Amino acid sequence: MPSLRARARAGEKLIGALLRMPSEELVEMLAVAAFDFVLIDCEHGPADLVALRQHIALAQVHDVPVIVRVGEGDRDQILRVLDQGAEGILAPHLDTTADAEALVAAAMYPPVGSRGFATYSRAGRFGLVDPADHREWWLENTLV
């Protein structure tokens, strides 16, 4: 199945669901209800990294991509979210071009951005994906 970014670029109408409270069952219900993606709110919602990791893993079991709303474009949070396998991030409070550029830099691998590179995460299939293939896939498919 094409990535969420590829589907959006192709003009496909996509329908997602917003999740603000941590609940594995809700993630699975949204996935089996045929939503195109799940948006997990880590700015206003109480989800921590452990809960987020579980939410992303459950969504992936059902081939449903996850976008995570991060607070203030926090570079460290963006790295952790994407390393857990979220296909994209949504960042509020971007007021300037420089804010947007910093967000893209945090989310994307070089040469587009400056995201740290680690293939031993969930996003890298725990080291089983060739590093060049990993980098290329995420450069092409990360949604910001």
Feature map (PLM): residue ranges:
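N-terminal amphipathic alpha-helix/helix-capping segment at the start of soluble metabolic enzymes
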Residues: 1-16, 128-142
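Hydrophobic faces of well-ordered beta-strands that scaffold small-molecule active sites
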Residues: 14-19, 38-40, 66-70, 89-91, ...
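Conserved, mostly hydrophobic/aromatic
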Residues: 17, 30, 41, 81, ...
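Short, acidic/polar
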Residues: 19-33, 72-80
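Glycine-rich, proline-tolerant flexible connector loops at the mouths of alpha/beta enzymes
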Residues: 26-54
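Glycine-enriched alpha-helix->loop->beta-strand junction motifs that scaffold or abut catalytic
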Residues: 33-37, 83-88, 108-109
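Alpha-helix-loop-beta-strand connector modules within alpha/beta enzyme cores
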Residues: 49-83, 105-113, 137-140
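Conserved anion-binding
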Residues: 76, 88-144
